[in-house]
Amino acid sequence: MLLDVKNVSVRFASGHGVQAVENVSLTVDKKEKVCIVGETGSGKSILLLAILHLLPENAIVTGEAFFEGEDLIRMKRRQLDKIRGARLSYVPQGSGNGLNPLLTVGFQVAEPMIEHQKVKKKEAIAEAVRLMKRFHIGDEEKVASQYPFTYSGGMKQRAMIAMGIIAGADMILADEPTKGLDEERIEMVVEAFHSLKDQAVLCVTHDLNFAREISDRISVMYASNQVEYAPAEELLEHPLHPYTQDMIAAMPENGLHFSEGFAMAHENYADGGCKYAPRCRFCKEKCKETPPMAEMDGHKVRCWLYAGKEGEAHASENGKTF
């Protein structure tokens, strides 16, 4: 086990307080790729930042995140700084938010090799240029000497991905690596992640097709809750949670827009109950209570449809056993 996240919650201590992540658990094995998917605001990016100690000071983080046996959440900043970059590589969300405007992009992509692998500057930049050309980043002739201001947003984002890959860390944590990219560039990112044979990946994305392409397992989040977690093929072919089913049905190739096909409930059960209930076609009185996480054949789902005796019957109809 490389990363073991146990019951991580994040609350922001301001105003009335905002619960951004609630009791999320997942694991990432060595060389495994896990994607966290969900709508904007579901808490998936905040979970990633919590693991890396990159949230603001008003964030209250509880739970555990063991990386090779060491709890990242309890770890001192100075100790974590030694791990980040060398063993954990982070690709932030946004078009090059992590790039220094005063340094060439070629040097910045090469810097993790220079800093953590102690590779000579000339050799590291040569490797960076090779990788950048592969991702079609920058001018072919000037790729080593260009500055961020000469790059488009998509180029900056691909440069950040190249920086994360070149470090050779045990694990890459990527936040929306395909955001703002066209289909051709997304294919380049897919190819890049497929090339990572010895590195694990924990990736946040709203793009289910991208998750399908690269994932071994997928965790689905909705309104700060983890609602489903299963092997990727199993989850995409046989989704159990109503939200996951609706999200997959809303994929463009399935012909349904996300606003269609939902039976709206008459009450908002956000306080203490299932947060998807107001949009769920299976909503019932029991949904006013918080559903437990049920596990069936390695497939986890947080829904009253799969809880208790009634849940066992419903699960068996879907070919599942507790």
Where are the model-predicted features located?
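Conserved ABC transporter NBD signature motif
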Residues: 60-71
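Short catalytic/signature loops enriched in Gly
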Residues: 141-144, 231-322
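Conserved ABC ATPase signature
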Residues: 146-151, 155
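A short, proline-enriched helix->beta-strand linker immediately N-terminal to the Walker B motif
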Residues: 166-170
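Catalytic Walker B motif of ABC-type/P-loop ATPase nucleotide-binding domains
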Residues: 172-175
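P-loop NTP-binding/switch modules centered on Walker-like glycine-rich loops
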Residues: 180-256
